[in-house]
Amino acid sequence: MKIGTQATSLAVLHNQESHAPQAPIAVRPEPAHAIPEIPLDLAIRPRTRGIHPFLAMTLGDKGCASSSGVSLEDDSHTQVSLSDFSVASRDVNHNNICAGLSTEWLVMSSDGDAESRMDHLDYNGEGQSRGSERHQVYNDALRAALSNDDEAPFFTASTAVIEDAGFSLRREPKTVHASGGSAQLGQTVAHDVAQSGRKHLLSLRFANVQGHAIACSCEGSQFKLFDPNLGEFQSSRSAAPQLIKGLIDHYNSLNYDVACVNEFRVS
């Protein structure tokens, strides 16, 4: 889920991140909802059989931590600086609709430049309302999947928002695990996504079973990645592993340990 922020504050989702970095950010928790302990394998292959539907809905791809007030520079937990790759730093996810915004970014990832895309997706932009509509498709599909006892409701919901945007899946969704650390995870994901002509909706799944949707596109030798909480990043294809590692390290440093990445290749 999205952690809402103001200028220099980072709120804590469901009071689960009380150990989030304290400086230079003041931590203010949102109203807490108790979430029972869930087995980690739900993050790896998100099955919800036996999980209360309300809980499963809270675990969908809605966002997690905003960039507002969060430095993208190197710290003790990361060796890759996201700021080296940032081309349009913007938090457009205050409305908690990361799956919808990421899908909308994929639709127009080849149009204009990074700043114009962020303007499109920002609060006064047409893309914000479209992203909200797309995210409603995601939520509706997730609810339907849960009511039908779907064993992979998050995959079903992601597929629904992809198809609603006019895309189709090029292959079955793929899950890449983080067992080898962020460098290996970044390398493995980049091998799949940083190929010319490929577009992906990606779902970061965290150890607390929360999810966050981002998107990426590779055109020629240029790799572009969009995170609704942080904005747009660009690199060469060869540097894509470092960019993805930097993003993973960013969330790990906020105690959102990335357990796996679900890949949805679209065309």
Swiss-Prot record:
Changing residue 63 to A: Abolishes the localization to plasma membrane in host cells. CDD domains: C58_YopT-like. One of its GO terms (cellular component) is extracellular region. The keyword Lipoprotein applies. The record marks 62-63 as: Cleavage. Cysteine protease avirulence protein, which is essential during infection of plant cells from cultivar-specific of beans and Arabidopsis thaliana. The autocleavage of the protein is required for virulence function. May act by affecting the plant defense system. In plants lacking R3 or RPS5 resistance genes, it probably impairs the plant defense system and leads to the bacteria multiplication. In contrast, in plants containing the R3 or RPS5 protein, it is unable to induce disease symptoms, explaining its avirulence name. It comes from Pseudomonas savastanoi pv. phaseolicola. A lipid is attached at residue 63 (N-myristoyl glycine). This is Cysteine protease avirulence protein AvrPphB. It is an enzyme of class 3 (hydrolase).
